[in-house]
Amino acid sequence: MRNIEMWVPDAGQADIAGLRGLDADALARYVADPAYPWWRRVPCARALAERVPERHVAHLISRVRDPGDVAEVRIALLDLLADRAELLPWLKHPDRRRERSYGMPEAFLKARGMLGDRSAARELATLAASPWARRQGVGEAGLDALVTRYGVEVVLADLGDERPEDRAFRVRMRHRAAADVTDALADPDREVAHLAQSLLSDPRRVRGYLDEAPTVEAKLWAAYALHRLTGDVAETRRVYDTLGRPRVEVAGLDDELRGAILHEYASGCERQSDPRWRVEALCSEPPVRPDQDEQVGRATAALTEAGLAPMPAVSCGEHHRQGDGTYHVMEFGENELFISTLGRFVTSAEPDLTARQALESAGFRWIDETTSAIRVPGLCVYYFGERAPVSVDTLLFYWQA
């Protein structure tokens, strides 16, 4: 197997073109042997595309069926053997739903789609609507296989249009057929409306829709799409003014906090977010961000003058030894001060009246427990696997690994 090792010298360094030049029998034997490193077996499976020796099929299928084998190898083999109808009864067996190896439930669904199993369509549509790119790609591949085999109308009929993910698939198919999907901006599900606006390409059609859109939210999606297509801020602001400048009102969130949060998160918020946040951000001026070195220096001086002996500040990423975010951490005694990079906002891990008074005298704004707990509705932000509204303290002092 020296030639295989030459073309795959280390994990992540596979030369698939080189592997394709090797004997198919040798590759099949290598893939089927769990004694070899999985990171070499996977590229060998990919190099077997469209040339699997028939005499090795049964052995390769046994590797797919073995839950003790490495998931990456089993997934690669499912892709390789996507035309083997004998796999379908096993794939549809209820036991497959109990497998939880990473990526396997999705791979089973994709394989069912590749093999023409229309009963997998609804679950594939759910996968295709996932915010995770890998899961989305798997779902789309399975649905595309069903469309290729049966035609788009059959698959659309299987799905219906009650669920948002089914309507999202319908929007994608209409767009693929070069049909106008502007009307989907009025879909009651924001993820579907967001998908529709991302597919629009004709500014004139979007302008025309502004007069016919049935809801303010649909008009906001149109304004957002129009700005994406033209970059014309003045036009976007005119539309926003015509609509009455609608925004999500949040009790306790004053203009200073709102501006800092809005211009940090609205442009990259999750697709289920309220479009009022997106358009408000386009139509308002961002606040001036503080000079971080000056801000840290001022906080250090204030705590030092108060006799609290602060340690040098570090970024939240350095403090956690991974990731990044929107604040610095400054230790003082047994406590920690958090200094936001979004404005003059500070808080501490434990309440400290001396630190608070010193910092407020130095021009900082202390974020107390009441303000920290304010939840910002409709602004969905990715935070440790969740995509949902979070509270002010998370937004001002955000860290992500």
Q: Where would I find each of the regions flagged by the language model?
A:
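Short inter-helical turns and helix N-cap capping residues of alpha-solenoid HEAT/ARM repeat scaffolds
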Residues: 35-37, 67-70, 98-101, 131-132, ...
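Amphipathic alpha-helical scaffolding segments comprising HEAT/armadillo-like alpha-solenoid repeats
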Residues: 2-4, 20-32, 52-65, 83-97, ...
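Structural detector for internal amphipathic alpha-helices that build alpha-solenoid repeat scaffolds
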Residues: 2-21, 39-53, 62, 71-84, ...
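Long, compositionally biased non-globular segments that serve regulatory/targeting/scaffolding roles
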Residues: 23, 246, 345-349
